[in-house]
C-alpha cells in the first residue's frame, strides 16, 4: 500500500478499519479493509478517522518481533497514534497524526471474469522478480495458471503460478 500512497486516512469503527485512497497520479486505487475479527481484542468507542504517514507507521511496525503483542491506541488529546510492542520489553512509539482533507473516493463496481486465491508471498516474489525488468507488471490468467509478466525495451520476464494446492 505504501508503494502507492504516503499519507492516508483510516476510517475506524466497531466493525473494521477501512482505507480507500488514490495514488498521487490518480491511476491506482487502494481499497483495504481489516475486519475487527482479525484482532484478539478490538475496542472502538465511536467511529473515527485517523490520518497518518504510512512510511512512518510501516517503520514502526517493522520493529515488531514475532513474539510481540501489538497495541494501537488513539490519543486524541495529543493528536497522536500510540503504537506499543510488548514482549520481554515494552516499546512505545507515538506517531503524530497529520491533517488531511478527507476526500470521498467512490469505489467502482468492477466485475472480473477470474478469481485467483494464492498465498501473498507468491505474488510478492513474482513482483520482485519482475522488478528486475520493469516498473510495471501484467497479470494474465489462463485456465490453470496465473502469469505475472513484465517487459522493457530490451528485456522481459514471466513467472507462472500454476493451479495447485496454494493457487
Description of each model-found segment:
Residues 1-2, 8-132, 140-167:
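DNA polymerase sliding clamps and clamp-related checkpoint/processivity subunits
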Residues 137:
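Polyanion-binding surfaces on beta-sheet-dominated domains and ring/shell assemblies
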Amino acid at each position: 500500500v505504501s508503494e502507492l500512497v504516503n499519507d492516508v486516512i483510516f476510517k475506524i469503527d466497531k466493525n473494521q478499519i477501512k482505507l480507500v485512497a488514490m495514488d498521487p497520479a490518480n491511476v491506482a486505487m487502494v481499497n483495504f479493509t481489516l475486519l475487527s475479527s482479525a484482532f484478539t481484542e478490538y475496542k472502538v468507542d465511536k467511529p473515527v478517522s485517523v490520518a497518518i504517514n504510512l512510511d512512518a507507521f510501516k517503520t514502526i511496525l517493522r520493529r515488531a518481533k514475532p513474539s510481540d503483542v501489538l497495541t494501537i491506541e488513539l490519543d486524541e488529546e495529543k493528536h497522536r497514534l500510540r503504537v506499543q510492542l510488548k514482549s520481554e520489553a515494552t516499546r512505545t512509539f507515538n506517531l503524530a497524526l497529520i491533517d488531511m482533507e478527507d476526500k470521498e473516493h467512490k469505489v467502482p463496481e468492477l466485475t472480473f471474469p477470474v478469481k485467483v486465491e494464492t498465498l501473498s508471498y507468491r505474488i510478492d516474489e513474482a513482483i520482485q522478480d519482475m522488478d528486475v525488468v520493469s516498473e510495471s507488471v501484467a497479470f494474465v490468467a489462463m485456465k490453470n495458471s496465473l502469469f505475472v509478466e513484465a517487459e522493457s525495451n530490451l528485456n522481459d520476464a514471466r513467472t507462472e503460478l500454476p493451479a495447485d494446492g496454494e493457487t
